[in-house]
Design a protein with these regions (language model features):
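Charged (Asp/Glu and Lys/Arg) segments that form or flank catalytic channels of large polymer-
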Residues: 1-172
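Terminal interaction-prone segments of large eukaryotic proteins
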Residues: 142-144, 149, 153, 157, ...
């Protein structure tokens, strides 16, 4: 099932975008992209299945309940591809020195120099990370130079590496990669600094604009690499999903990270910390789950009353 889903032409539950063949291309991020005219509603979504998926059989299920997980879409998706490509590209340009030897050996040495710059950048800003030293393996170039780069790291570590690379590219000068990382860092800034669950209209438009700048820049780099037959800047379905996230934020003013607390890793981690403080740490207490759910609900209610009104109340 996973293999068939991975190789399917259609990549989106919100529109008719496809990877290849007839249909709106999923890697078009322009304002006039064809897939923007093929939005699905709940009924058209359900008609696309020969056998309804189990999730859709839950009473009250609606398509709008399928929300974008910002951690897996942005931090563990788009950011990691952008960071991996930028590290490989800057190393190839000699940004961190020119070394002799095999390609992997040269990349390893260059990335170690890059890591030696990343560490003091973090210390100067009182940032604590658990990111190990950069190597060819950490950008998916350890086994073959023909693999598309992808940074391997935790979500929080990837965030800080992205912001460091934004500084590096800013000091190098104007280039498409700098525009890409500006857009990514602007989205990160809004997600981690502005309170939720609702954004003001101005901030929501800022997020949508940064998302559009980042995706258009990435698409431009991807087309240039494809024209030169280079294994760089591969476009994935998560880029398309991020495009939809920018539209949703602009339309609803809903904070892009409002579902963050319900991500599975975050949820499990919090539950384990709470359960460890209980009298019976090896027993998963329903009461613990209820208390955590109540705490999350109360925090969302406080944020809602302290921020702007929801769009339907304005």
């Amino acid at each position: 099932m996973l293999s068939s889903n991975y190789s399917t032409r259609k990549v989106c539950h919100l529109c008719e975008a496809v990877k290849y063949g007839a249909g709106p291309p999923f890697d078009d991020f322009g304002a006039g992209a064809c897939h923007r005219n093929t939005s699905r509603d709940h009924n058209s979504y359900m008609l696309g299945f020969a056998t309804p998926p189990p999730l859709s059989l839950i009473p009250g299920f609606q398509l709008c309940m399928l929300v974008c997980d910002p951690m897996h879409c942005l931090h563990l998706g788009v950011l990691q591809w952008a960071v991996g490509n930028a590290l490989v590209l800057l190393s190839g340009e000699g940004r961190w020195g020119v070394f002799e030897g095999q390609r992997k050996h040269k990349l390893d040495k260059s990335l170690r120099v890059a890591y030696s710059e990343f560490q003091p950048w973090c210390r100067c800003r009182a940032i604590s990370t658990s990111q190990p030293v950069f190597t060819a393996n950490s950008v998916n170039r350890g086994e073959s130079p023909n693999y598309f780069p992808e940074f391997k790291g935790k979500a929080s570590n990837t965030r800080w590496v992205t912001m460091w690379l934004c500084d590096v590219l800013y000091h190098i000068g104007p280039r498409t990669e700098a525009a890409l990382f500006w857009g990514l860092c602007e989205m990160l800034h809004i997600m981690h600094v502005f309170p939720g669950p609702w954004l003001t209209g101005r901030v929501a438009q800022r997020f949508a604009r940064a998302c559009r700048v980042a995706l258009l820049s990435y698409g431009c780099l991807a087309r240039a690499a494809k024209a030169d037959c280079l294994p760089l800047w591969g476009v994935k379905p998560k880029h398309h999903q991020l495009d939809h996230l920018g539209e949703v934020v602009a339309r609803t003013h809903l904070h892009p990270g409002y579902a963050w607390a319900f991500c599975d890793e975050d949820f499990n981690g919090r539950i384990c910390k709470v359960a460890a403080a209980c009298m019976h740490p090896h027993v998963f207490s329903l009461r613990v789950l209820e208390k955590y759910s109540l705490k999350v609900w109360l925090s969302l209610e406080d944020a809602r009353t302290d921020s702007v009104n929801p769009p339907w109340k304005t």
